[in-house]
């Protein structure tokens, strides 16, 4: 409130989708505030001073410029389990440089983004050596163990669907270098166990010699169905696989990370139900693929669900030997996302491509398409093969400025084109199948929720209830 005579005037700008955490959108806050004040100028003029008095008031508030103090040191307080000194190299504030309040604010955001602190403040504190910049940290009370729960649920009007409960556990700061133990478990249609020990090799994150080593293992069982060209199910198979790896890598600034290491997968197929002839001997044979893996993960999206800005790039390449193949075995996988918004409208462009060299008589293949936004209108995993290409453009609009029970409601549509091939050499833009969907979505605490209608160029139609990321 602004108090005065004869009445009080309430200024209540409509902030729309802006929230208290949108620090980087300060200019928008200012514009909205100015517009709100200008709309009430008539009421506000009752509080105005005469021009001479206002000029005198402004002159009395002017302070002579002073030089910013030069920082003698940077110091951290409040850390018990974590080692915040690891982040010194990525902070913009430096000992020996003049203090910059805006830079210090940016540094608090970088420290908060590490995930270990529930509060980060700063202050200047005099010392015998000079002014010190002190970062006051409050570690998350539930750390250093972090648990997350997610849910994947899908069903269509044919009755096909799946349910998966996802659990993750991260244990931070196992040693002073910031080692982590990362665990994931999936319960449901395709159960999975994953565990990784991640060990940084440097005391300073972001330094020129920064790097890490990671050893990991994964146990997974995946159901795969085979379909005839008309879309009728002909077989149900199960693939069990044990995969492990030893990686060496390094972060690439704030973009993401690169990894290079040894990789091995041991897998076996088994038949559950089949109406067609299958190579029984090959199905029961143990398959091994071992080699060298290169992986690049860059993620600059502003949100995991319904992002409004940014991009993401994932590249994986494996070269090695596989049981039964005389030539070298290869796997190449790539996916890219670019997101741009205009007001409440967002355009999301995605591309995904993959290919592998496998034995010709192995049924299906490791890559599948079919289901919501994976050629909508087809049954889940209806297409399978050894090469895949999918192009998708989605547009969605935020429906509510002040959502209830969710972080936002969205309405949107997608256009999709893609296919899979049994022969990897046939992958290309020719022969792509087209599809599309319209959907209503909500960003919930356990993942994005969709109610959608899908259609495919071959005549496939489906209604989806989908919880999770397509």
Predicted segments, located by residue:
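Conserved active-site loop/cleft motifs that coordinate metal ions or position small ligands
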Residues: 10-13, 412-414, 441, 448-454
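A short alpha/beta connector and helix-capping loop motif
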Residues: 427-439
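C-terminal outer-membrane beta-barrel translocator/porin domains of Gram-negative envelope proteins
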Residues: 113, 119-121, 132, 144-156, ...
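A short, acidic, flexible beta-alpha connecting loop/helix-capping segment that sits on the rim
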Residues: 15-17, 25, 454-460
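Conserved catalytic block of serine-dependent lipid acyl chemistry
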Residues: 1-18, 28-34
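Gram-negative/organellar outer-membrane beta-barrel architecture
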Residues: 102, 107, 116-295, 301, ...
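A generic beta-sheet turn/junction motif
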Residues: 80, 126-128, 340-344, 442-446
């Amino acid at each position: 409130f602004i108090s005065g005579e004869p009445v009080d005037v309430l200024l209540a700008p409509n902030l729309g989708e802006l929230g208290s955490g949108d620090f980087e959108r300060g200019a928008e806050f200012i514009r909205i505030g100015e517009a709100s004040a200008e709309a009430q100028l008539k009421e506000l003029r009752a509080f105005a001073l005469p021009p001479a008095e206002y000029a005198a008031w402004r002159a009395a508030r002017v302070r002579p410029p002073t030089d910013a103090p030069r920082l003698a040191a940077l110091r951290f307080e409040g850390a018990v389990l974590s080692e915040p000194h690891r982040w010194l190299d990525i902070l913009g504030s430096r000992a020996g440089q003049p203090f910059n309040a805006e830079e210090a604010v940016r540094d608090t955001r970088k420290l908060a983004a590490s995930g270990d602190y529930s509060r980060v403040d700063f202050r200047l504190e005099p010392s015998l050596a000079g002014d010190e910049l002190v970062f006051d940290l409050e570690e998350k009370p539930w750390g250093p163990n972090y648990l997350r729960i997610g849910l994947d649920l899908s069903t269509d009007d044919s009755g096909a669907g799946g349910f998966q409960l996802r659990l993750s556990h991260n244990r931070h700061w196992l040693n002073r270098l910031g080692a982590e133990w990362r665990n994931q478990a999936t319960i449901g249609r395709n159960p999975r166990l994953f565990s990784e020990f991640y060990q940084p090799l440097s005391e300073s994150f972001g330094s020129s010699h920064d790097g890490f080593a990671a050893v990991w293992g994964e146990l997974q069982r995946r159901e795969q169905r085979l379909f005839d060209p008309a879309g009728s199910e002909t077989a149900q198979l199960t693939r069990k696989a044990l995969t492990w790896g030893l990686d060496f890598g390094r972060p690439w600034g704030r973009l993401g990370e690169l990894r290079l290491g040894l990789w091995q997968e041991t897998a076996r197929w088994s038949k559950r139900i089949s109406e067609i002839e299958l190579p029984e001997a090959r199905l029961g044979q143990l398959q091994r693929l071992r080699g060298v893996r290169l992986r690049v993960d860059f993620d600059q999206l502003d949100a995991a669900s319904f992002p409004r800005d940014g991009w993401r790039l994932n590249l994986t390449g494996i070269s090695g030997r596989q049981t039964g193949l005389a030539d070298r075995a290869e796997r190449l996988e790539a996916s890219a996302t670019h997101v741009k918004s205009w007001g409440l409208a967002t355009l999301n462009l995605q591309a995904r491509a993959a290919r592998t060299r496998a034995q010709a008589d192995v049924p299906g293949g490791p890559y599948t398409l079919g289901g919501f936004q994976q050629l909508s209108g087809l049954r889940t995993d209806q297409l399978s093969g050894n090469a895949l290409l999918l192009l998708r453009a989605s547009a969605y609009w935020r429906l509510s400025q002040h959502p209830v029970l969710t972080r936002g409601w969205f309405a949107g549509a997608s256009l999709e084109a893609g296919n899979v091939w049994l022969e990897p050499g046939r992958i290309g833009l020719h022969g792509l199948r087209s599809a599309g969907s319209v959907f209503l979505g909500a960003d919930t605490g356990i993942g994005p929720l969709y109610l959608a209608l899908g259609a495919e160029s071959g005549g496939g139609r489906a209604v989806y209830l989908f919880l999770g990321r397509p």
